[in-house]
Regions:
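N-terminal helix-turn-helix DNA-binding module of bacterial transcription factors
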Residues: 1-39
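Alpha-helical recognition/docking segments in bacterial nutrient-uptake
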Residues: 36-153
Length: 153
């Protein structure tokens, strides 16, 4: 009923909503997600939120996602390979609907495939969006800025 089932009459919906309000009931987001294909949650990882570019990018992402009814879980992974992988795995365990990686550090060093394998593995479970980084693979979506041109302008 709380998930908006069309099989529940309007009269019953109103009664249930009144009882919920009267008792200050808040639905459990995890229990709600059990019956749905979506948790309406996006995981966002950046290396360091203290960086002004990262902070602005994350603030814009979060604001935009909230306008579409999505909650966000933010993680600041640092730059170490193991830490980045741990954050990705932690967010995947939270049943996120998609993963957004902010910053070129997630694209690896360009020499070793292994350092981005964890991203391709994550993309097998949920869509992965990379901002200012590029990794090739299925279910991976990348947007890159031309930093040199931006500096010139």
């Amino acid at each position: 009923m709380v998930n908006g089932s069309p099989r529940v009459s309007e009269k019953t919906k109103q009664k249930v909503l009144a009882v919920m309000k009267e008792n200050d009931y808040t639905p459990n987001v995890f229990a709600r997600g059990l019956g749905l294909d979506s948790m309406k949650t996006v995981g966002i990882i950046c290396p360091n939120i203290a960086d002004s570019y990262m902070a602005k990018a994350v603030a814009y992402l979060e604001s935009s996602l909230h306008s579409y009814g999505y909650d966000c879980i933010l993680g600041c992974s640092g730059f170490g390979q193991e830490e980045k992988q741990n954050y990705v795995n932690m967010l995947l365990s939270k049943r996120i609907d998609t993963l957004v990686l902010v910053g070129s550090t997630y694209a690896g060093n360009g020499k070793d495939e292994y350092d981005t394998d964890y991203i391709r593995e994550a993309a097998e479970k949920t869509p992965v969006f990379m901002i200012n980084g590029r990794v090739r693979g299925d279910n991976l979506y990348c947007a890159c800025a031309d930093d040199c041109q931006a500096t010139y302008e």
